[in-house]
Amino acid sequence: MDGKVGNTTTGCPVMHGGMTSAGTSNTAWWPNALNLDILHQHDTKTNPMGKDFNYREEVKKLNFEALKKDLHALMTDSQAWWPADWGHYGGLMIRMSWHAAGSYRVADGRGGAGTGNQRFAPLNSWPDNVNLDKARRLLWPIKKKYGNKISWADLIVLAGTIAYESMGLKTFGFGFGREDIWHPEKDVYWGSEQEWLGAKRYDDKDRQSLETPLAAVQMGLIYVNPEGVNGQPDPLRTAQDVRVTFGRMAMNDEETVALTAGGHTVGKCHGNGNAKFLGPEPEAADIEDQGLGWINKTTRGIGRNTVSSGIEGAWTTHPTQWDNGYFYLLLNYDWELKKSPAGAWQWEPIHIKEEDKPVDVEDPAIRHNPIMTDADMAIKMDPVYRKIAERFYKDPDYFAEVFARAWFKLTHRDMGPKTRYIGPDVPKEDLIWQDPVPAGNRAYDIAAAKAKIAASNLTIGEMVSTAWDSARTFRGSDKRGGANGARIRLKPQKDWEGNEPQRLTKVLRILEDIAADTGASVADVIVLAGNVGIEKAAKAAGFDIIVPFAPGRGDATDDMTDAESFDVLEPLHDGYRNWLKKAYDVRPEELMLDRTQLMGLTAHEMTVLVGGLRVLGTNHNNTQHGVFTDRVGALTNDFFVNLTDMANVWIPSKDNLYEIRDRKAGNIKWTATRVDLVFGSNSILRSYAEVYAQDDNKGKFIQDFVAAWTKVMNADRFDLA
């Protein structure tokens, strides 16, 4: 290509301005500009299924038993192009499921197996996911057969669960309902490193400073480095890494030991060869490789000669059956450091009995030493983990039960409440990590409840702020939080600084009495009060409206709430209420963008909500920043009118504060934060602000505000169609 546009004989026939793989992006030109792309994902333009397709309804038509039968058959149907170890694909399928679910992190709820994201970059090409492309390709005939009735996300998780069943474990259950995405996620921060296995996520040497929200120690790993900290064996240091990373996946010490042991009871590591012969990962592979990566085109590279992690060997004597052999070998033998054929650090037993060695994956007449990773040795050497391991060793049934429950938690943690689970194998038991909420009353007089709220002495700001605070905790990432359950009245939420405990206590006292009088749940009354406040504010602006409301929220109790698990939902900032708990390295407008994405809102919904909430008097602690109106409590478009008025000039005052002055007179009219001014500064957000500032769009502003408000209030109403 010589780049001469229009030269049809010797030049490139493609207009370079339209090329998809070249050119400089806006982000490259202006790296500090607010990037709204994370709010514009997973829409109809990328989804081939059409707007009328509803996976959660389609999966109900699935022949569940036939699918499971086919998966059982797949486990022992070894394919020549990628042979099964010992004739059983169980270990491979479990690793695929584990690595899909294990990317979840509790801090922001992102990652996990709920979207089928392992099919896309970067996860499909992570160093920790070497050869999992083969597992998904082995599943393709089953996906092809059952089609739209089973998502990749569900199938990837189910395959690991069925693998355990096929090897003798009684699993705890399974819930269908994970919907596929169709392109890589733009909102997930996997780390700032520019190279695989980079580790620029710590700022000290004691391994306690892993960057939030990350839950893996190096770029491209699921949790810890199996060879040791930064590839150097040290089981006690690795134990610290294990505890931190599993904790950030919402697992306690017992669950951590169970998952580590149960994951390593079956299958093996692969490092019997030279890693330099592996081809590039899937995203960098040649077009003729058709999406498969790490292809060895130099040596055999399959079966006993496979290289994945570089560690070589099985953990147990019988790697295709569920048993207690992991603890038997780990606790009864002494172990020494060795190097695998691929050059990776691993632990091997000293003076092991021949009958305790696992056989070769291809020739049962050959036996090899079992191996342990540094993480396994951490289970043996860390005193807390060791005590748990010894109990599991002495009580195999207890171990199997704890593991089955932990596996279920691992693979369902990002699905939200149990009401979202579909299928015949959903456990009846309510689990506290599912944040259970009882069914609410729908048969009460909504009009009477609204009348009592309107007659109370609550201000518009108090009603709207309380409803907002109750609902804003919702995270679309793992479907946690939200207004349903009214957990804002329970610990820890009632004491969060962002919820203004003194104001909250006053408002809840009044709303709880109204709930008791009308038979409504407190959760419903909180939302209803916000709606009443908005209706009053719209009337003050000259518009009579009814804010949509769907009754039926329930009230959770302390017994239904794992208070500690809700700590990660505490808002440390809220641009919608113009509040920061403290100064952060990240710019306030970027924090608001992250919050907006988690809440499932678009850029124009964010815009209209901020503009409306400012004039309703909902700022945290009643600050006046961004309140560009002299009619507080009226749902007007004044925020946008005054933001876009060139009669004003914006002057920096101090960190994150600005003065809005009259351009001619110079007097201060208002103050603002960066969150306010970004709606006039960012070209995209300004285009939305101008729409809402127009003289003919006062009604549209209210209509759009109410629609966005209702979306937030109902974000966790999975019971609604």
Swiss-Prot record:
Please outline how this chain is modified post-translation: Formation of the three residue Trp-Tyr-Met cross-link is important for the catalase, but not the peroxidase activity of the enzyme.
Binding annotation for heme b:
264
- Mention any Pfam family matching this sequence: peroxidase
Concerning Gene3D superfamilies, the annotation shows: 1.10.520.10, Peroxidase, domain 2
Q: Which reaction does it catalyse?
A: H2O2 + AH2 = A + 2 H2O; 2 H2O2 = O2 + 2 H2O
Q: Name one GO cellular component term.
A: cytosol
Q: How does it assemble?
A: Homodimer or homotetramer.
Q: Which family does it belong to?
A: Belongs to the peroxidase family. Peroxidase/catalase subfamily.
* Function description: Bifunctional enzyme with both catalase and broad-spectrum peroxidase activity.
Stated name of the protein: Catalase-peroxidase 1
Name the species this protein comes from: Legionella pneumophila (strain Corby)
